[in-house]
Regions:
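A generic structural micro-feature
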Residues: 2, 63-65, 108-109
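Core segments of cupin and vicinal oxygen chelate
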Residues: 2-3, 9-52, 80, 87
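A generic structural signal for ordered alpha-helices
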Residues: 6, 23, 56-59, 63, ...
Length: 134
């Protein structure tokens, strides 16, 4: 039996601002934007090429906004991905790698090249470059 992670809840304070950030600046696909009753709204977005989506919502969960850290997006070319984010107005860190427990500015080896950014609500994201696939 397969167990698949399909949806991650991302706690936010402002649905419209978060939808614009993820849809227009980060480049996620907006799959769904629906109002469920008077107090509940759900927006589903999916990163290009991903099988896992995220929900931005109000009135569904009791998760404080801005508490998620380490949400990880794996990309084939971190320089291109980071440049796309910066071009769209996202503040992204320099490209870094971990060396003996310390972050160092420059590329690392396989699976050890990263950049970081946060959404407007303070949730932290990690870009990680995967090795080239044959």
């Amino acid at each position: 039996m397969d167990w698949r992670l399909e949806v991650v809840q991302v706690p936010i304070t402002d649905v419209d601002r978060a939808k614009r950030f993820y849809g227009e600046q980060v480049g996620f696909n907006v799959d769904l934007d629906t109002q469920i009753g008077d107090k509940m709204r759900l927006v589903q977005l999916t990163p290009p090429g991903s099988a896992c989506s995220m929900h931005l919502s109000t009135g569904i969960h009791n998760i404080p906004p801005g508490v998620l850290e380490g949400l990880q997006l794996v990309v084939p070319d971190i320089e291109v991905a980071r440049a796309q984010l910066v071009e769209r107005g996202v503040e992204a860190s320099s490209i870094q790698h971990m060396d003996d427990g310390v972050w160092v500015e420059r590329r690392g080896g396989d699976w050890n090249t990263f950049a970081f950014f946060s959404d407007p609500g303070g949730n932290g994201w990690v870009l990680q470059e995967r090795p080239a696939r044959d």
